[in-house]
Amino acid sequence: MSPQGLTAQTDRFQNQYQSGYFLLEGRHAEKKEDEIQTIYLDTGRFAEWDKGFDFYAPQTFIDQKGRRILIGWAGMPDAEYTNKETLQEGWQHCLTFPRELILKENPYSGEPQIYQKPIDEIMKLRTGKCIPITQKTTQFENECMDLLFIGLPESFVIEIADGVRIVYQDQKVALSLTEECGSGRTIRKTTIPVIETVRILVDSSILEIYLNDGEMVFTTRYYKKAPGTLLRIDYENVRGLAYPLQAITVNDKTRNRTV
């Protein structure tokens, strides 16, 4: 659901509008949709799909493999920040990468929650060999990357494109963008007790950041000035993997064309 009017808190509901879900239990979970008349829900149990700047009005469906897939709108209506760089090219928003939704117990809280992970088909977009990330500064030629970091310390900084920073310290994670890179986007932050893995899908103007295999996700548009993908790491014993990605190809059989 995508409610409007939730009061912003220190680490929740920081966007103009929110998107998220409630986990229903007992008799409500067992009823069919047309049997449910009125349910009173506590907003304290409302779980946001995404903690970043640009995520709204997601849709889900069941695919041929029986997976529940979510695709979100990477944009935020009535936000203070803009997409002036793409507006100059005649377009503004885009869609997120399809995410598989998995309901399971959070090992840190012991509570059930929905995890999100990029669908496995992303592996078909990987080109060339896997590139180990062992240096604190790495420049990739490719605009689109699939980055994975493991063995993370209790505090760390990951910076992309000279302007997007992911900072984790004292169980607080923050995503911040400079004015030049963020086009008005500033900072989004929240609490997470442990971060063991960080996966980042890098496209030319959108980042999707998955923490702990999808326990928490941040999505943001960004606008870099230099080609390729610049990566800076601020912690010791860097361990990561990088996969260059090619574009998604869509076969339009109705018009006999590929886009």
Predicted regions located by residue number:
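Internal metal/ion-chelating core segments
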Residues: 1-35
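Beta-rich accessory regions
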Residues: 20, 28-259
